[in-house]
Amino acid sequence: MQYIVAYDFGTTGVKTCLFSIDGGIRMEASAYAPYGLYILPDGGAEQDAGEWWAAMCSTTRAAFEKTSVRPEQVTGISFCSQMQGMVLVDEHANALRRPMSYMDQRAGAEFRACQTHGLTISGVNAGMMLRSLAATHAASTSVKDPLWKYKWVQAHEPEIFQEAHKWLDVKESLIARATG
């Protein structure tokens, strides 16, 4: 029998499921653990990468304890998560500061300085939007987008910005930590 562990990292907790995958897909066990969402008075919304990791570890143990499945029987791991977060990490994938949630709205000034001048479409610079759409099929049109969080850290926490090796989203930071 082969098994997959699936993690779903939501805004306030993780659900971990253990599936058997021989001859179909069947959920064998699941577990849930909450973690914090820290709303700051300046529009910030942060989480704690250590809390994500602790919740992942505890729910993994709990799911396995509900079955006779052994970890070596797991042939795959899947992650899905909230999007548009920002986790600044060092070379070892350690978070340098609390991750900024998709709900964080502190970067209004950085967004406006770059996006709201010249000809605009829905408040966003038309030329920048069209170039971005042509190159990536996406455009950063909200203060909540990770680009503006990155620019906010650059302006307000330059020492952390200088230490950052990579900028990752939620699930990518957890994959990096889990895989080294």
Predicted feature descriptions by range:
Residues 1-98, 109:
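N-terminal glycine/serine-rich phosphate-binding loop of ATP-dependent small-molecule kinases
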Residues 61-180:
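Glycine-rich phosphate-binding/catalytic subdomain of phosphoryl-transfer
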